[in-house]
Amino acid sequence: MGKYMRKFRGATGEELAAMEVTQVVGVRTRSRSAAAAGATTTKVKAASAASTRRRKALLPTAVVGTTRRDGGSCYLQLRSRMLFMAPPRPAPAARAPVVAEAAGSGNGAAAHAAAGLSRCSSTASSVDAAAQDRSLACRSDVAEAGSEHVPEGSASDSASGRDRERRETTPSSFLPGEVSDLESDLAGGQKRSRPLPSAATASAQQATRPKIPPAAEIEAFFAAAEEAEAKRFAAKYNFDVVRGVPLDAGRFEWTPVVSSRS
């Protein structure tokens, strides 16, 4: 600290020591650090208070609207928008099961067979349905007469037999006689649908057919061509191809050759 001290004389001649306090950049005193910390704390508190006020402003502070007692819809008037609340869906009512009480085991078997017949009636033919109705009536009478004395094994066998009969039947929408009549009608319609050729059609077909020249004309055409070719060959090689003999006048001399076979 000696360099910051200097001595000077006062008016009375006393020597006083004075200290020069210089401002050093980057150095803080305790009072300045405390003031900066207090300012930072104040800013943080102000920011948290502002965020709290903003969050409270976004919440629906006022709700305007009424809810109907009968479960109807209502409107909620919020500060920013209006919200529509739909009524809750009513729970589906439970379907009451229909239970048919049978008087005895025979009636129960007949009802079971009738239910099976109704399930398979959509795919069975009319003839099969009539036969099944007759057999069902007979079986129901027998079941009513001796339902108490029929063992369980025979009942299961009869039920399996009925199921087998229903499976073995082939669905058909026409009787055999109707099918044969329909096929004959279709065949007759196809035969009748073929139109007979008329005179104009026959003449048109005749005109479109290629015309073939007669045999005499064809023979005359090829004979003229063969004659011209024979004349050209005789003039060039002094040989008559029609008769098969050489000609005297010419530059070629023809010599007969005896074949080995002869």
Swiss-Prot record:
Keywords assigned by UniProt, alphabetized: Cell cycle, Cell division, Mitosis, Protein kinase inhibitor
| Name the UniProt record assigns to this protein | Cyclin-dependent kinase inhibitor 1
Q: Name one GO biological process term.
A: cell division
Which molecular-function annotations from GO does this UniProt entry contain? cyclin-dependent protein serine/threonine kinase inhibitor activity
InterPro entries in UniProt: CDI_dom, CDI_dom_sf, KRP
Identify the Gene3D superfamilies for this entry: p27 (4.10.365.10)
Q: Extra info from the record?
A: Plants overexpressing KRP1 show a reduction in the filling rate of about 2/3, and no embryo is observed in the empty seeds or seeds containing underdeveloped endosperm.
Give the record's GO CC terms.
Answer: nucleus
Q: Where is the composition biased (Low complexity)?
A: 198-208
Q: What does this protein do?
A: Regulates the production of endosperm cells, affecting seed filling and embryo development. Regulates endoreduplication of endosperm cells. May play a role in the exit from the mitotic cell cycle during rice grain formation. Inhibitis leaf elongation rates by decreasing cell number, that is partly compensated by increased cell size. May not affect growth rate or cell size of the primary root.
| Region feature (Disordered) | 140-212
Q: Which family does it belong to?
A: Belongs to the CDI family. ICK/KRP subfamily.
Q: Where is the composition biased (Basic and acidic residues)?
A: 160-169
Organs and tissues of expression = Expressed in roots, stems, leaves and apex.
Q: What induces it?
A: Down-regulated by cytokinin.
